[in-house]
Amino acid sequence: MILDIDMLRSFYASYSESVAQAKATVKRPLTYAEKVLFAHLFDPSQLRPYKRGVEYVDFRPNRVAMQDATAQMALLQFMNAGKDKVAVPASVHCDHLIRADVGVEKDLPEACKTNKEVYDFLKSVSQKYHIGFWGPGAGIIHQVVLENYAFPGGMMVGTDSHTPNAGGLGMVAVGVGGADAVDVLTGQPWELKMPRLIGVHLTGKLSGWATPKDVILEILGILTVKGGTNAILEYFGDGLDSISTTGKATICNMGAELGATCSIFPFDGNADDYLRKTGRAEIASLAQQNAAELRADDEVLANPSAFYDQIVEIDLSKVEPHLNGPFTPDAATPISHMKAKGPANDYPMVVEVGLVGSCTNSSYQDLARAASVARQAYEKGIQVKGQLIINPGSEQIRYTAERDGILDDFKKIGALIMTNACGPCIGQWKRHTDDNTRKNAIVTSFNRNFRRRADGNPNTYAFIGSPELTVALTIAGRLDFNPATDTLLDKDGNSVKVDVPTGFTFPPKGFAVEDKGFIAPSEENANVEVVIAPDSNRLQKLAPFAAWDGKDLIDMPLLIKTEGKCTTDHISMAGPWLKFRGHLQNISDNLLMGAVNAFNGESNKVKNQLDGKYVEVSTAAKAYKAQNISSIVVAEDNYGEGSSREHAAMEPRFLNVKVILAKSFARIHETNLKKQGMLALTFCNKDDYNKVQEDDRISLTGLKEFAPGSHLNITLKHKDGSEDSFEVEHTYNDTQIAWFKAGSALNFAARK
């Protein structure tokens, strides 16, 4: 059985009472996010008015979801915990390792062959420890979770940064690293800094070409990629009624690009419909019984500024179709401005490829509305200028869309139908292009557009829009085509407009599927053997990291001083490296290969201080490690922005990097660094970043007095013999300091 019905019945039986107790304790009305948070305290007796953005709180999530690229490391860690089964319902989803090339018919069998060792490991470890397993082709983790597992008022963690997608159905769903997931899987408290609350007030109604995707693209322009850090975005207002559950999921999904802990919508009639249409009528009824507590209290809605830390006002009737990019998702541009902005910024204006799919926009409604645009091109005889690629979100969606003729609408204009998987969105794309050195533009319905992310090509300018706009721009072949005002030529040379997209929220005949691709958890797991070949280059058992030796870190060579944006894609590249996600030694060869060296402006070229030669980052790190020398990385703002991949923390730890000193950190990555026993430190004065020189030997002192709220000391020994000193700060609490001293959070847990 897919649904964990007993857990859900038990949860709803006590949910409203838990919320009532929280209100009585804090003595005020609650926002919806607060209700869910307070209802999931690991120890309810510790309930109090926690200070947002400051205090760490222990929670007890209802479930865990893992995708195949991050599940490997998470489950390798779980295997060392000595448990017979997972403590909460959990699932593994095989969606990240499938490469998009020529179409699903060839790509899926090739992926099953190429990744057989990893799939066999994940399947067997799932059977061994009572975890639901969704095989390759079953679908993208967050779409599958929304269709099968998400429920209003619940809390889940997932080893993927876009886990907040489930907030569209009213969950507090948080992306985490594997070590955090292991905490939940083993029944330990899961620690999270009490989030700030950003209220997003939606009024009016979307119209024309504007979609839910454009709502979050506009918000990204307002708040930026750092604006949601350590915050939950809670949506409220009369504008909610006009947005479907899958549309709300899209908005919550891209809250990750704001750096938000998660985003959440209240339970409403649209959520009730979605639950019933996806075969969860009992859950809908249970939610209805608790409906009063699956939303913010009336007092909150009447005076939101008294309860939220920040308010963002969005009038949906004024939202325009957006095209965000290139290279960062917060570069927000209404499509009506692109005619001026494109040439002014020297963007390549020809759209070569349009890509529809990803966990952000691959629902039935997304495909139906995008297909209505494709259908018009075919029926009106409009020549399609670019290549169109489609990735359905799940096998249920693919099967239903095929039955309803939606996929045929795409195929009629030459679209390639790829596997129900992430594909190009996370760099799993064998792009066929005639010249990799040419500046070129692609348009996607994805969530991220970092340089090199989709196709590995630094000359690709990637822009993010809705599925409908993506198809329209691909048909037009122009980045500045505004479907609301511009025309195209039909086969007879007549100017024709593309009408406003249409499409059903739910399939009129209902969802259908022959085989979802799911293997239920086994009750007979004692004899299941999890085999990892000793000579495997894909999987490697983990050895514990060494504990702190009790000494300060003296004369560390600077491994790299990064300049500008340094995301987890820069730190631990995906694409061709995904195959090594279960092998720490091998994947560490990609350490910081995408980061820009502040001293030469180049990527993956740093000075090895032992011989003065310029080498790859991992080569320098390995040289230092071979001499038992610790090293340090210095970075700018929002270091570690992007995905939840803990490899970006484990790789430097494995290669003996002890400190990451940055102007600021992205939330998930900072936690991942702490979990792996590293020191994630920030400049007290950001200008001190400029004092760091290429040949510096750097000392960190004060570690014996390392305590919450304390400062540590940095001394830079420059090549000319001069020195600079300054203080650095941190956000470690007592438990996290214990992780550092033990060598990692897992080491600390094993010693308790």
Whereabouts are the PLM-identified features?
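Terminal amphipathic helices with adjacent charged low-complexity linkers/tails
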Residues: 42, 46, 51-60, 74, ...
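Non-catalytic terminal/interface segments that mediate subunit docking, oligomerization
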Residues: 76-80, 306-401, 405, 524-659
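Acidic, glycine-rich flexible loop/linker segments
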Residues: 488-505, 670-739, 746-749
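Long, structured ligand/cofactor-binding scaffold of large enzymes
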Residues: 8-11, 15, 20-195, 581-633, ...
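Mobile "lid/hinge" segments at catalytic clefts and subdomain interfaces of large enzymes
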Residues: 3-4, 68, 151-285, 416, ...
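Extended C-terminal subregions enriched in glycine
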Residues: 379-429, 435, 643, 649, ...
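Short glycine/threonine-rich loop-to-helix capping motif typified by GTGT followed
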Residues: 47, 147, 151, 243-249, ...
